[in-house]
């Protein structure tokens, strides 16, 4: 098994990814659902650029994931936070996250919006088709395809990614 490749992005990189997304949108959207936590910042940037003011959030967990992985099954999502159906019904809704890895989280949110009567489209900065659990399914909009673990600039000062950055070679100025 190959080691996971990491890619550390700057704020300028994120700006370029957002700029790449904007001309792709074929429809106007009435609402946006930002998936916590990864979709908050790119979703906010997109909402500002697109003039979307009806902004909602969704938080999803897969609590039984370890047991399910051992059995090679998919865990059911637990929605920790989700907008009421009345806020989604009949609305063209853009669902935003930072990355489509396995696709479980954004697919769960998209399906729940559809069940509520909304008209969802999915949008991510990075699409990883190599981890995708949903066959040929892919985000409606994405900036880049990757096989790397992406470290966004809002993630670099905390958690496990801090150790990654500490290993980055420093060059004399």
Question: What is each residue range found by the language model?
Answer:
Residues 1-173:
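PRPP-associated nucleotide enzymes
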């Amino acid at each position: 098994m190959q080691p996971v490749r990491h890619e550390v992005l700057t704020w300028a990189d994120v700006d370029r990814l957002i700029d790449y997304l904007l001309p792709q949108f074929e429809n106007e959207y009435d609402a946006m659902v930002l998936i916590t936590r990864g979709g908050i910042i790119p979703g906010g940037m997109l909402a500002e650029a697109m003039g979307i003011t009806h902004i909602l959030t969704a938080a999803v967990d897969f609590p039984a994931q370890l047991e399910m992985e051992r059995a090679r099954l998919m865990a059911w999502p637990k929605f920790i936070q989700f907008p009421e159906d009345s806020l989604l019904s009949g609305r063209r809704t853009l669902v935003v996250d930072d990355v489509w890895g396995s696709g479980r989280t954004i697919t769960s949110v998209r399906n729940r919006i559809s069940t509520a009567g909304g008209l969802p489209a999915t949008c991510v900065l990075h699409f990883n088709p190599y981890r995708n659990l949903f066959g040929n399914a892919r985000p409606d909009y994405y900036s880049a395809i990757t096989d790397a673990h992406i470290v966004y600039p809002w993630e670099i000062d905390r958690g496990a990614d801090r150790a990654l950055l500490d290993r980055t070679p420093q060059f004399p100025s």
